Amino acid sequence: MDGFLDLYLQFNIPSPIEEATWRHWFEIWLKELGVQEPCELSLCLTSDEHIRQLNREFRHLDEPTDVLAFAAQEMLAPFGIQDITGVRLLGDIVISVPTARAQAKAQGHRLSQELAWLASHGLLHLLGWDHPDELSLQRMLQQQRQLLAAIQLDGEVAHGQQP
């Protein structure tokens, strides 16, 4: 799928996952989700302090969280801005590595598995998925499990809840 995905990676904290692996996972996930057009997204791995600032600024919650997703369409649509390059701008995913590490420990699996779970959750948000109620949440969690199965991590991340 060369040229299909422009993935921008920013690691404010070292990633236990190689850049090529991140790219491979996102390409598989986008294919699994039926995305056919070229697209662009960014992934930032960061600290609790940084994600807390973002959470406070954009969600008015003064606390760290595990993952934030900023969908480009939500940000650009009010201004009538459209991409004229033919590349679908998905947006940005930000993951707190310290929070992911704590969640991985609590769930009894590796950090890399938790990061994949959180990245898949963020990607679904960029593609318009949301979980305003329990049924929507369960559907989204099931889709995440399918995405992890597509990269052979299905049995290793057994989340039942996602905040």
Swiss-Prot record:
Q: Name one GO biological process term.
A: rRNA processing
Provide the cofactor note recorded for this chain's UniProt entry.
Binds 1 zinc ion.
UniProt key word Cytoplasm: yes
Q: Which residues bind Zn(2+)?
A: H121, H125, H131
Q: What's its job?
A: Single strand-specific metallo-endoribonuclease involved in late-stage 70S ribosome quality control and in maturation of the 3' terminus of the 16S rRNA.
HAMAP family per the record? Endoribonucl_YbeY (MF_00009)
Family listed: Belongs to the endoribonuclease YbeY family.
Name the keywords, alphabetized.
Cytoplasm, Endonuclease, Hydrolase, Metal-binding, Nuclease, Ribosome biogenesis, rRNA processing, Zinc
Single GO MF annotation = RNA endonuclease activity
Q: Provide the E.C. number(s) assigned to this enzyme.
A: 3.1.-.-
Q: What cofactor is needed?
A: Zn(2+)
* Main localization of the protein described in the UniProt heading: cytoplasm
Supply the name of the protein. Answer: Endoribonuclease YbeY
Q: Which Pfam families match?
A: YbeY
Its ancestry begins with: Bacteria, Bacillati, Cyanobacteriota, Cyanophyceae, Synechococcales
As for subcellular location, the record says:
Cytoplasm
PANTHER family, A to Z: ENDORIBONUCLEASE YBEY, CHLOROPLASTIC (PTHR46986:SF1)
Q: Does the keyword Transport apply?
A: no
Per the record, GO CC terms?
Answer: cytoplasm
